[in-house]
Amino acid sequence: MAAARVFRSTALRQFPVIQIRRNATLGTSAHGDVINVQQIPAPGAGHIRVLLLNRPQARNAISRQLLNSLGKHIDDIKAEQGKGPTRALVLASNVDASFCAGADLKERATFTKQDTEAFLAQLRQTFANLDELQIPTISAISSMALGGGLELALCTKLRVFGSTSIVGLPETRLAIIPGAGGTYRLPRLIGKNRALDMILTGRRVSGAEAYFLGLCNRLVEVTPEEQGKPGEAREKVLRESIKLAQDICEGGPIALGQALKAVDGFERGAEAENEAYLGVVETEDRFEALKAFAEKRKPSFKGR
């Protein structure tokens, strides 16, 4: 196996230092405390919304309450249509042991058949809405992401893993299959053969192998000493994820949205790229970039 490129956590240059309180809420969510929220200033204007899953007693398993809360946050961002104050989204955990353990099987055991069908429909729609957001989205994972937890991470555009991460789709070992997008989002990301290996065996994949497979975009080194300190790995991966979001948000908001559209439509080739290019070439941001280049200064983008 080729050696993974490891990103060592660095200071957030040119931006406010972000203090992350370990094992503590980062503000109160309007949608309930199963998700804690922080808004980080983005370069120029707007903010990066950080959502921290917070069900420590259930390893962030997806309950009705958690799904409702997550869905409302995603709906809020979707309503902005890429033109609001939310420049990027980082999805992370407020729990050391797990990013997300998938479905809440204890709660699921109480469901009727109709309850299960309704829950799955809501889960799939929420994940689809996340997948379709018109802003950069990042999952920050430093621990376990299994089953629906990995399927959730597959819905974001980018993923930052710690070297301590363990991910997988173990459903076939439970006599079912991934049911929230894993069977098509995973092969779309890493290819059919590699996806079949993970899905058919149900095996767990380390952070290093996930990077090798193309499952994550960044791999953050967590030392044994850091791993032994509560919150250290989680904080380190979250910082790298926020830094990535800040770096991305240095770009023009319209250009970022059009780039996402173009890459999402890559199978159409030049047609998708040309359509997206027409959406940026005559914008105020584009003219500001040209002017700033001539004047040897940093551009000030307005999202227009």
Features from the language model and the residues they span:
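Conserved CoA-thioester-binding segment of acyl-CoA-metabolizing enzymes
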Residues: 2-92, 128
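C-terminal long alpha-helix characteristic of the crotonase
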Residues: 44, 160-165, 216-272, 278, ...
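Short helix- or helix-capping micro-motifs
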Residues: 101-103, 186, 194-203
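Acidic, divalent-metal-coordinating active-site segment for phosphoryl/phosphodiester hydrolysis
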Residues: 203-209
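Glycine- (often His-adjacent) and acidic-residue-rich active-site loop
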Residues: 85-86, 92-128, 145, 175
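Glycine-rich beta-to-alpha active-site loop
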Residues: 126-174, 204
